[in-house]
Amino acid sequence: MIIYYSANQSKSGLKILLKNEPCLILENQFVKPGKGQPFNRIKIKKLISGKIFTKIFKSNEKLIYADVLDVKVKSLYKDKKYWNFIKKENFEQFKISKKNLGEKYKWIIEQLECIVTFWDENPINITLPRFVDIKVCNANFDIKGDTIKSGNKYIILTTGAIIKAPIFIRSEEIVRVDTNLGEYVSRIK
């Protein structure tokens, strides 16, 4: 069953189909010019690619509701190309490829609780917690050409990510990382 909304009815947080791709409405601004028809200027985020753009719709134009589902999951383990997850509600297991996870692949650890967005029963997006605690596997290496010594150094995490951290961080310690910025936040004791 297809559900339609007029551009006037759309609110931020509503998920719609645009050019056969699920999108999230971030902002909806109604504009009534002095001359001409009123319209809606809608800020939209594509759920698959993550691109954000603004599109103008006539006020009476119909938008198609996107049947997407956000599911709480827990990461289990990774193999060469995939991360394996389990749905918390029914314990069904599924995989997401490293390619589909993109940069978020670097911040996933075992037993991490996150939210996966499904469309047509396929995972299209993953929302990680803002902060993740990850073990440092190597804190004793330098990047060639980095001759300026400051209060920071590069460290390698068990996930394979390389980040800057203070010089007092040692191997085998656990650090808190901001998954949105990809930066060191603090040391966990």
Swiss-Prot record:
Give the sites modified to N6-(3,6-diaminohexanoyl)-5-hydroxylysine.
35
Keywords assigned by UniProt, alphabetized: Cytoplasm, Elongation factor, Hydroxylation, Protein biosynthesis
Listed GO MF terms: translation elongation factor activity
**Modifications made to the protein after synthesis:** May be beta-lysylated on the epsilon-amino group of Lys-35 by the combined action of EpmA and EpmB, and then hydroxylated on the C5 position of the same residue by EpmC (if this protein is present). Lysylation is critical for the stimulatory effect of EF-P on peptide-bond formation. The lysylation moiety may extend toward the peptidyltransferase center and stabilize the terminal 3-CCA end of the tRNA. Hydroxylation of the C5 position on Lys-35 may allow additional potential stabilizing hydrogen-bond interactions with the P-tRNA.
Q: Which Pfam families match?
A: EFP, EFP_N, Elong-fact-P_C
Write down the NCBIfam families for this protein, in alphabetical order: efp, PRK00529.1
Pathway assigned in UniProt: Protein biosynthesis; polypeptide chain elongation
Subcellular location per UniProt equals:
Cytoplasm
- Role this protein plays: Involved in peptide bond synthesis. Alleviates ribosome stalling that occurs when 3 or more consecutive Pro residues or the sequence PPG is present in a protein, possibly by augmenting the peptidyl transferase activity of the ribosome. Modification of Lys-35 is required for alleviation.
Matches recorded under PANTHER family: ELONGATION FACTOR P, ELONGATION FACTOR P (EF-P) FAMILY PROTEIN
Q: What is this protein called?
A: Elongation factor P
Matching entries from Gene3D superfamilies are given as: 2.30.30.30, Nucleic acid-binding proteins (2.40.50.140)
User: Which source organism does the UniProt entry give?
Assistant: Wigglesworthia glossinidia brevipalpis
Look up the record and report any one GO term of the cellular component aspect. Answer: cytoplasm
Main subcellular localisation: cytoplasm
> Keyword Metal-binding, does the record have it?
no
Its GO biological process annotations read: peptide biosynthetic process
